[in-house]
Amino acid sequence: GIPNEFPEKVMKQAQRVPDHVLDADRDGRLDLRHLQTVTIDGEDAKDLDDAISLTKEGDIYHLGVHIADVSNYVQYNSALDREALKRGTSVYLADRVVPMLPERLSNGICSLNQGEDRLALSCLMDINEKGKVVSHQIAETVINVNERMCYTDVKNILEDTDEEAKKRYEALIPMFFMMKELSGILRNSRHHRGSIDFDFPESKIILNAAGKAIDVKPYEANVATKIIEDFMLMANETVAQEYCTEEIPFVYRTHDNPDPEKVESLLTLLHNQGVKIQKAKEEITPKEIQQIIESIEGLPNEAMISRLVLRSMKQAKYTTECSGHFGLAAKYYCHFTSPIRRYPDLQIHRIIKDNLRGRLMREGRTEHYAEILDEVARQSSVCERRADEAERESDKLKKAEYMSYHLGEEFEGIISGVTGWGLYVELPNTVEDLVHVNTL
């Protein structure tokens, strides 16, 4: 099961962590407090692990992705660290969060809260107008976030639908438009190389004060969520590429090529559905999968075919080999941007800091990492599966609760899957269930 309470030893250690940045911690760090910096998250997020700064000189964008320096407060093999590794990830259930770290850290000193000095690990990238990172620097920094934004406000400012937000955040508006511009460039560049975008609507379950599900609706990605996604992907790739090239022991996020047999049966199935795809070589490429997804857009059976394509894919996992990410069509990829809620990110922050401080070659650090990382990657992958499953089950329970208030009503939906025992129907609000063959 998923651990719910933190052991006393862990809580005691969390209590001892300072709630503000100490002068000694600032020593030797790059001071970026002068940069115009924002966080952009959901309205109710409390664990803010990433902040953004962006300027442009000539045709070069200077993008700063600033990530909370959690490893400054969670020491290797401390009680806090062992508990975090055991949990592997925070779990976001429909009615609560089961955090990887105690809230005193995750919502306090490790959260990039507005107007507070915070320690960060920053990936500073110079990006040209084609979306290529021409140079980058990873540095230990001190930052101070000017504004805690939420996705909705940024989206409304960019779509010009909220005068009040425009007035309130007037000083930041040029930066938001520049973000939108760079995000579009990065997205195009990823699309060009074959990155696959499955556009499945996620669910947003609305609960009342008593925790009962009162509404279920699709959670839509928008211009603001895409900006953050694009910038995080870029930082993750940039970090992974540097460490893979340097051949330093590391934890990567990898996604293997699909199983050839599954691909064959998928192509046959698609052929029968009237979707004709030729693959050039033995192994299918991300670009070819991308073309399948694009060729079915708007078709009545789009949802069903997208699911079939997704099922032919392997699951992404954490590994110590940098074997690439099929779905992103990326040669290098890692998880660097969420150390408050994912252990692999916290783990690689330690490696990066040891490297920046010149400690890897001394003190046997390289051997130490070579010894522990396979197990960290394995444990993190297992915890991620466990969390995904718990999140799915929790969503299903809340959706069932919501639908139980609508018994006897008629709903229109699309057939999202067919099996020997019936058909799966998905409603516009993302609720999906089986219509059993016996009831047809």
Question: What is each PLM-predicted segment?
Answer:
Residues 2-440:
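Electropositive polyanion-binding surfaces
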